[in-house]
Regions:
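Surface-exposed loop and turn segments in beta-propeller and other repeat-based domains
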Residues: 1-30, 110-125, 130
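Electron-transfer interface patches adjacent to heme c in soluble/periplasmic c-type cytochromes
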Residues: 76-79, 83-89, 104-121, 128-181
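Signature of short aromatic-glycine-proline-rich micro-motifs recurring in repeat-based ectodomains
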Residues: 22-38, 73-74, 141-142
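Short loop/turn segments that connect beta-strands within beta-propeller blades
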Residues: 2-4, 59-63, 100-104
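Beta-rich catalytic cores
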Residues: 33, 51, 73, 119, ...
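Conserved loop/turn motif of beta-propeller repeat scaffolds
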Residues: 42-43, 83
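Short loop/turn segments immediately following the C-termini of beta-strands
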Residues: 50-51, 91-92
Length: 181
């Protein structure tokens, strides 16, 4: 691969996108909601999956070389100057994982103070969890509602110029909620 060559690599080559679901083992291998990438001196890339709670190492041609489970919501990556350690910011559980790049394993996890209210801290991962909310393990509600924001799109693919579909968002127990998906 030369620097001027453009290459597109599927980060989930094990998936059959003609299917709506796969085995639990395949789903667990999926990288969901990639959020950060850092390149090592050898050209390999480290990529975090915020929705799948792991980091992968991929070669310059996109071949997956390693998968490392980390804390919830890995969003940031920093490689040490010597390339021996990869630091991963795990947003949802308020921690930093230290990855030993030689063994491709989590060597340590440091938890830090997170002032986020407990209800939000416990509920936020559900919006991003690609393993629980996707038949293939690579997308979640947050894939369309990026960073839990509203996109203000009608999502009527038959009439893109249509008006926004309104729905009852209260969905309290023992009440009928609108089917909005």
């Amino acid at each position: 691969v030369t620097p001027t060559t453009k290459t597109i690599a599927d980060l989930n080559p094990h998936l059959d996108y003609n299917q709506t679901t796969t085995t639990a083992e395949n789903r667990a291998q999926s990288l969901g909601d990639p959020r950060a990438i850092v390149f090592a001196a050898d050209g390999n890339a480290w990529i975090s999956g915020m929705g799948s709670n792991h980091v992968i190492r991929a070669s310059v041609d996109g071949t997956r070389l390693a998968r490392i489970d980390v804390g919830q919501g890995p969003t940031g990556l920093v490689l040490s100057a010597d390339g021996g350690k990869l630091y991963v910011l795990n947003k949802f559980d308020g921690s930093i994982s230290t990855i030993d790049t030689a063994s491709a394993s989590e060597a340590a996890r440091l938890v830090f103070f997170d002032p986020t209210p407990a209800a939000i801290r416990q509920g936020r991962p559900m919006l991003y969890d690609t393993q629980a909310s996707s038949g293939l393990g690579q997308v979640a509600c947050a894939s369309c509602h990026v960073d839990a924001k509203s996109d203000f799109l009608a999502w009527d693919l038959g009439n893109p110029a249509g008006t926004m579909k309104t729905f009852n968002q209260t969905c309290r127990p023992n009440q009928v909620c609108d089917d909005w998906h």
